[in-house]
A protein has these predicted regions:
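ABC-family P-loop ATPase nucleotide-binding domains
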Residues: 54-128
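Walker A (P-loop) phosphate-binding loop of ABC-type ATPase nucleotide-binding domains
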Residues: 1-5
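Helical segment within the ABC ATPase nucleotide-binding domain
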Residues: 144-159
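Walker B catalytic motif
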Residues: 134-135, 142
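Conserved H-loop
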Residues: 159-167
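Conserved beta-strand-loop-alpha-helix hinge in the C-terminal portion
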Residues: 179, 183, 187-210
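ABC ATPase NBD Q-loop/coupling interface
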Residues: 25-41, 106
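Helix-to-loop junction immediately C-terminal to a conserved catalytic motif
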Residues: 14
């Protein structure tokens, strides 16, 4: 539900400066992320796909991607034929044309282009934890399928994980979740497997607030 704390949770994990955590820890691979700066969390493998990505006029997509990969994975990862091959393969997977690289970051992008660009970054960086904040929002069925294909390609065969924040179960038809958590008023009120998504589609959320399972 809107206002339940989903985006707040994502921003806290990533280290947004507007949020202060008074207690608790956020642990990844045995390390407390709350003790790190945002850039340190990124280098440790945390990636956040924004719900509303900002445009950056004057910065070309190709340059942005190369610099991003270099900043997270090191300069060598952003050089040579191997990087170009991976970039080309990832763009093909997401149905992104080569001309996209010459455009400015999110400048004049459609909603679908912004979402695919976020997933393109995910595929190139291959983080340990990808936080995808309503990546499926505003997409049609084909768009959801394409984005899901990119998510699967990024985490398949790795020890990486994805925290997918969504209002709907449609994307879960293409990205198989291990666990589903329902967040209401800042608290996890229900946890289950993939079948929980179907139950929520059928019943909505009111039964979780009232405590009834009818």
């Amino acid at each position: 539900r809107n206002g339940s704390g989903k985006t707040t949770t994502a921003n806290i994990i990533m280290g947004h400066p507007d949020y202060e955590v008074e207690s608790g820890i956020v642990e990844l691979n045995g390390e407390n992320l709350l003790e790190m700066e945002t850039w340190e969390r990124a280098r440790k493998g945390v990636f956040l796909s924004f719900q509303y990505p900002q445009s950056v006029p004057g910065l070309q997509v190709g340059n942005f991607l190369r610099k991003s990969v270099a900043a997270i994975l090191g300069d060598e990862a952003a050089k040579g034929s191997e990087f170009r091959k991976k970039l080309k393969e990832s763009m093909k997977e997401l149905d992104i044309p080569a001309s996209f690289l010459g455009r400015y970051v999110n400048d004049g992008f459609s909603g679908g282009e912004k979402k695919r660009f976020e997933i393109l970054q995910l595929m190139l960086i291959k983080p340990k934890l990808a936080i995808l904040d309503e990546t499926d929002s505003g997409l049609d069925i084909d768009g959801i399928r394409t984005v899901a294909k990119g998510i699967n390609a990024a985490i398949r065969g790795t020890d990486s994980g994805a925290l997918i924040i969504t209002h709907y179960s449609r994307i879960l038809e293409h990205v198989q979740p291990d666990k589903i958590h329902v967040l209401i008023a800042g608290k996890i009120v229900k946890t289950g497997g993939p079948e929980l998504a179907l139950e929520l589609e059928e019943k909505g959320y009111d039964w979780l607030e009232t405590g009834s399972d009818k």
